Curated annotation (Swiss-Prot):
The lineage of its organism: Eukaryota, Metazoa, Chordata, Craniata, Vertebrata. Gene3D superfamilies: Classic Zinc Finger, Potassium Channel Kv1.1, Chain A. This is Hypermethylated in cancer 2 protein. Residues 296-308 have a biased composition (Basic and acidic residues). GO terms for cellular component: nucleus. Residues 224-242, 348-362 have a biased composition (Low complexity).
Amino acid sequence: MELPNHAKQLLLQLNQQRAKGYLCDVIIVVENALFRAHKNILAASSIYFKSLILHDNLINLDTDMVNPSVFRQVLDFIYTGKLLSSDQFSDHNFNALLTAASYLQLHDLAALCRKKLKRNGRSLLNKPTTPTNGRTSRNQRLSSTPVTPNQMSGLKDSEKTKRHEELIKDDLSEDEMFARNTHCTTSNSLSPSTSKNGSNGSCGMQELGLDLSKKSPSGSTATEEVSPSSIPQESPQSASESTANSASFDENPNTQNLTAGEPMELGVGECEESQPPPDVDQHKSSRQVTRQRRQPKSEGKKGEDMERVTLPNGVSKRLKVAGERLPAGGNGNSEVSFQCKDEEEGLENGQEQSEESGQSENEGGRNSANYVYRQEGFEPALGDNLYVCIPCGKGFPSSEELNAHVETHTEEELYIKEEDDDSYPKEDEVEAEDLSSQITQVHGTETRRFSCSVCNKSYKDPATLRQHEKTHWLTRPFPCNICGKMFTQRGTMTRHMRSHLGLKPFACEECGMRFTRQYRLTEHMRVHSGEKPYECQLCGGKFTQQRNLISHLRMHTSPS
């Protein structure tokens, strides 16, 4: 005893959660575009992601292998099992999808792209001769075979049996749409009277084929709700009546298997709205108006991002019928929304120091701008402007325009001196060593054997010296994709990006406060335990955190 559509309903809910950013625990960065997702979904779909998400919550993808628009389609396929391409499934789009699928080790998507590229009729243009098996191509059979009224009546009978199933759900592959569209176009060009007689059958499918093929600016894949039992079953009588019908319907079992094994689905509402009215004249006029209205829109918005597309009224209605429509940005808006926000003492330092206000000495005493990741509900998509300038919040359609815009900012705006998560513990230890060195030089209580060759500062161990020497390096090959700040190590850059994205995986069991770094949590726990491991060698003062000791040591070294 089971629910037939339980899996699809569950996947639909997960996709809606992804669109709203609910319970998303991983960020995928593609150039400057950020996509939120769930680790368990990615791990179940991709071997590549499965090996990465165990170690980090932030994943940077190779921009030579995948771009933001292609990865959005990949992510939609992972969450829905459907491909709704804004390029009408062109060769270029499938090649890009195949490259990305192979790179991310999505074997089902890669196999689907290979089959589609193999089936594409454009590959036959390079072969003017007939195929090796002696049969003419499907396109040639469709365009050269005349259609008789008897054939149309058979199609009309089969259409009646299918209407009831379409009212429930209907999944059509791209091959079905192409075959039916071509079949009806041939019928109208060869026999106008035939199209009138069979308007309920073939012309209905012509409207269906036109409507679906023109629907390049697709809506939300997260809102389409499809039952697995809705795969249309073709009538054997209609499939065997004529050569033209066999040309259209012989492909259906194959495409149905392709749809079942490698989902490439379309929602039920799209088929319901495209059913022709009984009146033939009214049907013709409405179809002409629909063509005139949709043709410029589909051309004007070709290549536009799916979530920001203003769909025709008919398509919007279909999506509402198919499922609950998400607000403004339906395609699982995977991009992260940011808000520039000024706070005192950084993301976590201000909270920690407020907890320890009785003993903590506020070393900075300054306002620093931090970029705070805001995940409050669902916000409108950025549309074409995938590349966002974090300091001012402006979006740009290309990375070149973003880079040109970033150069207009002053250095102070982009490289804000803030108490970064990466500065401690190693860099703070270096500063503490420097201050202690000055103190010991005055009091003569300790000797340092390891000296810096650049500034002659000395340290008591080589590890601290190496960390100090990195501050003199001029090359910083790892930039932050969000603010542009440069780092000498990849791990340091990754930890820095957590401050932008608001990823705080470490939580205090006592009070629930969350932190981006493990050592921050360890320091915070001392507030509850009362431990003070950092002691001043001059006056014996003890502190819970090392930065408080640094502030205290400055008092001893200051001229006053």
